Amino acid sequence: MSYMTPQEIVHELDKHIIGQDTAKRAVAIALRNRWRRQQVDEPLRHEITPKNILMIGPTGVGKTEIARRLARLANAPFIKIEATKFTEVGYVGRDVDSIIRDLVESAIKQAREREIRKNQPLAEDRAEERILDALLPPARDLGFEASPSEESNATRQKFRKKLREGELDDKEIEIEVAMAQTSMEIFAPPGMEELTSQIQGMFQNMGSGKRKMRKLRIREARKLLTEEEAARLVNDEELKLGAVQNVEQNGIVFLDEIDKITSRSEVSGSDVSRQGVQRDLLPLVEGTTISTKYGMIRTDHILFIASGAFHLAKPSDLIPELQGRFPIRVELESLSAEDFKQILTNTDACLIRQYQALLKTEGIELNFSEDAIGRLAEIAFSVNERTENIGARRLHTVMEKLLEDISFNATRYGGSTHVIDAVYVDERLGKLSQSEDLARYVL
């Protein structure tokens, strides 16, 4: 779980997302409140529930990016799902309970990776010993000596030195390793995902523990044995118990495209199923108990962050009960030309830096002048204004079109330097951006 202060969280988000200060502050406070709650004594701690957030804003302004970055900062069980994937219980499709099952699976995978990283040094030592045993099989104990001879120890140390220096990487050895588990795909009716996963687990357990001899190069054997030893050092029971508790206390669910399951009075037909999904979400967001193969999971303290563009619908089109479960509402603003300029240059992995790094692999040096960056921002902004507003995603299309010739002929231009200025931008994009029909289909 993250111990960062709200200011530190916003500072980290600022490295990747331009603007949207209100949304950043809201998610920063929500994340910090997770830590604050843990410091409160029982029984009051149990009564403090998370205040769920609804982010409203057009596409391409940073809603999903905030979720992606929050997942990395949170260091807590996190899952991002699309609301449109789910259907009302009884219809063909996934039911909303699978959100929590997926969250638990994600938490267990995260915990296992963390444990494996922690055990990596010990696992590498054990793998090294197994390789040395294969290279120098220990002498049989005949009862005459209490310990291995000094000569065999010296030989082992020589081989250990060669092994660490990589001199034996291409040598082939025969080792005993665990057999790879064959995955079995089982197709089940909707709503039976839990049963399906249990059957798959049963078949996997039947094949576990089997071992076989394999001939491998030491380079490959070291990697395989390290993974095997690291997995062996993990206590699965403790890991699962810890992951379940972590989900219940610190889990975060990001529910994207929630506006697509709203029901509008002038539209009928599919609205029945949409309302059904909303009603199925209600107990999940309010707090209920979900059965998973790792045990019962209570959702009372899981934080839900929902987002949607709400172009064709309004937040008030959600059923009133669900509206009440998202007390914090944040409106994200459309991006200005200045925002586009900042996105191109001022984030840690800005688009210009990405394209410079990509073309540098071909020996091409790309330099962008200030007026070129300003012109690119103006073009992206004006095309968004005159056609569909797709936010910052427009910059990807504009940059691809701008650098199409250089990218295609990169091998011919190798070792050269290209200066991109406003004149070059207008040559490549001027006509396209001025013609609404061309801009609509090309940019």
From Swiss-Prot:
Residues 142-162 are annotated as: Disordered. ATPase subunit of a proteasome-like degradation complex; this subunit has chaperone activity. The binding of ATP and its subsequent hydrolysis by HslU are essential for unfolding of protein substrates subsequently hydrolyzed by HslV. HslU recognizes the N-terminal part of its protein substrates and unfolds these before they are guided to HslV for hydrolysis. A double ring-shaped homohexamer of HslV is capped on each side by a ring-shaped HslU homohexamer. The assembly of the HslU/HslV complex is dependent on binding of ATP. This is ATP-dependent protease ATPase subunit HslU. One of its GO terms (molecular function) is proteasome-activating activity. It comes from Nitrosomonas europaea (strain ATCC 19718 / CIP 103999 / KCTC 2705 / NBRC 14298). Keywords: ATP-binding, Chaperone, Cytoplasm, Nucleotide-binding. InterPro entries: AAA+_ATPase, ATP-dep_Clp_protease_ClpX, ATPase_AAA_core, Clp_ATPase_C, HslU, P-loop_NTPase. GO terms for cellular component: HslUV protease complex. Its main location: cytoplasm. ATP binds at I18, G60, V61, G62, K63, T64, E65, D256, E321, R393. The keyword Lipoprotein does not apply. GO terms for biological process: protein unfolding; proteolysis involved in protein catabolic process. It is found in: Cytoplasm. Belongs to the ClpX chaperone family. HslU subfamily. It comes from the Bacteria.
